UniProtKB/Swiss-Prot annotation:
Gene3D superfamilies per UniProt: Ribonuclease Inhibitor
UniProt keywords, alphabetically: Leucine-rich repeat, Repeat
Family (UniProt): Belongs to the PRAME family.
Name by which UniProt lists this protein: PRAME family member 10
GO cellular component, one term: cytoplasm
GO-annotated biological processes: negative regulation of apoptotic process; negative regulation of cell differentiation; negative regulation of DNA-templated transcription; positive regulation of cell population proliferation; proteasome-mediated ubiquitin-dependent protein catabolic process
Cysteines engaged in disulfide bonds, as pairs: none
Superkingdom as given in the UniProt entry: Eukaryota
First and last residues of every LRR repeat: 97-124, 179-203, 204-230, 231-265, 266-291, 292-323, 324-342, 348-375, 376-400
Gene Ontology MF terms: ubiquitin-like ligase-substrate adaptor activity
Amino acid sequence: MSLQAPSRLLELAGQSLLRNQFLTIFTLDELPREVFPLMFMEAFSMRRFEALKLMVQAWPFLRLPLGSLMKTPHLETLQAVLRGLDTLVAQKVRPRRWKLQVLDLRDVDENFWTIWSGARVLSCSPEAMSKRQTVEDCPRMGERQPLKVFIDLCLKESTLDECLSYLFGWIHYRRGLVHLCCSKVQNYSMPTSSFRNLLERIYPDSIQELEVWKKCSLNKTGKFAPYLSQMSNLRELFLAFGYERELYVSVQWPCIPDLDSPFLCLYYPQMLYIKKISNIKEHLEHLLRYLKNPLGAFIFSDAYLTDRDMECLSQYPSLSQLKELRLIHILMWTTNLEPLGVLLEKVAATLKTLVLKDCRIQDPQLRVLLPALSHCSQLTTFNFHGNETSMNALKDLLRHTRGLSKLGLELYPAPLESLDYKGHVNWEILTPIRAELMRTLREVRQPKRIFFGPVPCPNCGSWPSEKVDFHLCS
């Protein structure tokens, strides 16, 4: 007899019980645990819903990974499994063989079914399988701890599909007996009120990643604060609020909202990304004030910064330890940049990426920034592309990078002297100017990757990712 023969005999025994409809809860209590996965797969493929219900009641493993078996949601299958759970949670005394603690509806554990189907029977014994069946995603449970149902929730429509609707309705009427655990929740389309109702049915400690895209005014973002305050294990948060989906907040650690603030008060944020918010001048100061711990990255794009906004950037502790600062497509040609220089001084010891791109910074403003920029010794990337500066101002800028030995990528605009009256580059003029700029730079340090002028180069299509000391098209 081959080594796979016992597996085949178990499969045949299970098929016989199912096809002859001899299966009862008493029969299942007497069967070896190795039979269950094979029988469950058979009942699943044959749509034997009563058998599925009974097998859930007698399931001899800690976890039932239904999601990896049911690739496409099937309402009747889900109903049968949940009816089996109903019988379990309603019993005051648990059945003798009851071990089931988690129904997992995520597609995360195909190995369980392939092992027991015989595809990998030679490499995994029942004892080893028993060790694999742990409940890693939830706390250790005592005798009367709630059952847990795991699912990843991605809402791309305004309403739930029939399976999710049934599941959430089932959960609603079994509070305290069953916890719905969602480690990852994404909402792209569901209305705010409906989504908040769903959050009330999810076990809050289970949420580790939350992503919300909503069109609403910024002063309504605080409606999510009461829910976030309960998510003690939240590791990643991505929020996009506003009429153009422009305010992004990314967190890597727990966040504790200040319920008195219209903004979400994030205690351990990593990144704040603000884009195209027309009324940000009414909110930026408020937002920065309520960020309690230092940000790792601040990205501000396609908006207008007033002088007061600039002052805010230099005043609040939340921006005092930035590793990444990106100001992109922000018209600064009339803005006082002295506060930005103060901010650069504060973050000089931590800043690694500085992007001041397409901001129309002119010579007088650039010179205000140079002393602070020269102290940013950790800088590895500097993008100053898309600004309006002369050759002499760029030379001055390059000289001030003498101490920035870690710079690996630099992007600079074509000097004003090389542009025609339409703002287009005259390559015959730019070529010798760039050579002179490179001589100026090499007098103070040796560059690694550097670009002057349009990116990508309109002549050869080169990008600054190429490892060239100096890009020059003829």
